[in-house]
């Protein structure tokens, strides 16, 4: 009993640390490329998002769920892939991790508190995007991410077996083992999605990453737009994979 409790605590702590590392990496890339006025700022941010995610998932998947994204976790809860209390615990750990990442960035930042938060806080890109553009961009980006995360990690295809462990469908073949490639797949997905929202929402598709600088700056403009789109998009992506695009058995 004590061992199980310790494992749960370790898993929650691992999810918090994973979220902290991801948040610190992404926030640092955004701040650094903005201050340095890097012409390749968007490329730097996109690569940071993708590469950091790959390393984090490989490092933490033995200890925790390694979602570091409340939209994925909420979709897992609402599709029955995770218990409610357990999932809410992970979501809280993720949010705490992202808030700590903002705090760490503020200590490291060479510019002021307000300026730092203004740079990393998600906001519509300065190209004339309206609320509808932002909402649907975040909706689709999060839906794509969650669908792929479900397909390769949260709810990968598993053929039905009988009591002897044999496939119920005699024509069934051994499924592809995605445990090795799933972190790479998810990281690359995060990377290409980061480029897709450049001219509208900025490409956040992570409620924890969005909410932390909003809380720290106490500036709530647009936050409902991002969070609503991200959670709704995540739910649609999860439902689509679980109930529509999960491979059907012939039996």
From Swiss-Prot:
It comes from the Eukaryota. A motif (NPG) lies at residues 206-208. Aquaporins contain two tandem repeats each containing three membrane-spanning domains and a pore-forming loop with the signature motif Asn-Pro-Ala (NPA). In microsporidia, the second signature motif differs slightly and is Asn-Pro-Gly (NPG). PROSITE patterns: MIP. The lineage of its organism: Eukaryota, Fungi, Fungi incertae sedis, Microsporidia, Unikaryonidae. InterPro entries: Aquaporin-like, Aquaporin_transptr, MIP, MIP_CS. One of its GO terms (cellular component) is plasma membrane. It is a multi-pass membrane protein. Keywords: Cell membrane, Membrane, Repeat, Transmembrane, Transmembrane helix, Transport. Water channel required to facilitate the transport of water across membranes. Involved in osmotolerance. This is Aquaporin. Belongs to the MIP/aquaporin (TC 1.A.8) family. Residues 1-11, 64-86, 155-179, 246-251 are cytoplasmic. The gene is AQP. It comes from Encephalitozoon hellem (Microsporidian parasite).
